[in-house]
Amino acid sequence: MTAKTEEILESLKSLSLLEASELVKQIEEAFGVSAAASAGVVMAAPGAAGGDGDGGAAEEKTEFDVILESFDAAAKIKVLKVVRNATGLGLGDAKALVESAPKTVKEGIAKADAETLKKEIEEAGGKVTLK
């Protein structure tokens, strides 16, 4: 890491949550990007709470857990492949997760990501719930 990037990193570490939120907004405007798309839940939660006013965040959940409830025995390998791709687990760990259903596949992910993963697992032959 260069001295310049280290200095910037140290400056960022000293920011309060409010200052960090303002910085993110300024970066989004300056570069025409959205932090919510790349950072997922971490950046989406403060934005949702600020945009809805008081009580808005409590009405709609922003983080979801994807839970594999069961799977069709004939589709075990397909479900296993989807779980491995989604979690980055090794073959043995993914197999243990799938075989111990009901089991949480991913925790605290954005609604869109959770729904996408649910659809992929269901298409492979698994039964999934979002909590």
From Swiss-Prot:
One of its GO terms (molecular function) is mRNA binding. One of its GO terms (cellular component) is cytosolic large ribosomal subunit. The keyword RNA-binding does not apply. Keywords: Ribonucleoprotein, Ribosomal protein. The keyword Ribonucleoprotein applies. Homodimer. Part of the ribosomal stalk of the 50S ribosomal subunit. Forms a multimeric L10(L12)X complex, where L10 forms an elongated spine to which 2 to 4 L12 dimers bind in a sequential fashion. Binds GTP-bound translation factors. Belongs to the bacterial ribosomal protein bL12 family. This is Large ribosomal subunit protein bL12. It comes from Prochlorococcus marinus (strain MIT 9515). The lineage of its organism: Bacteria, Bacillati, Cyanobacteriota, Cyanophyceae, Synechococcales. The gene is rplL.
